[in-house]
Amino acid sequence: MNAVIHGMREGALTLAYCAIVTARDRARRLANPTTLGVRAVVTRDGRLLMVRHRSGATPWSLPGGGVSRGEDLAAAALREVREEGGCVVQVERLLGMYFQGDHGFNNYVAVFVCAATGDARPPVGDLEIVDARFFLPQDVPATADVGSLRRIAEFRRGLVGLAEMW
């Protein structure tokens, strides 16, 4: 019975999360058609940190999010990794700046390469992130978002200073 209740709760949370994210994204696009975000390629012992979002066609991604007004890009990356992945990291370098634009909305993303100083601890009871873990590069989920998969491939090839489409 507990499994049924848990499943119903998770389903309700997923529906609520989808509605909130959709409404938030639409409001953001109207209020501010240009955004700035960060992502992080986080490594530890040859593994890569991925976080799983509650919903979406591609729920696994590199940790990251929006940059707050007046916030330093590297500080935003550190904060996002701590919030989504539950681990402390050190920024090693900037991998590149990326652009994603569609339907009048422009999103710029700075991607940093970081080294983790501890294990991932996914947030408990979080509405957005339901899992965070380190994967060997060949085991990164194929359902990860395409932009994250591209950034991982660029990182593995040793590329730096990129300016590409997300």
Describe the function of each predicted region.
Residues T34, T58, N106-Y108:
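Residue-level preference for beta-strand/loop junctions
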Residues T43-E83:
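Conserved Nudix-box catalytic region and its N-terminal flanking loop in Nudix hydrolases
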Residues V67-Q90, Y98-F155, M165-W166:
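Unchanged
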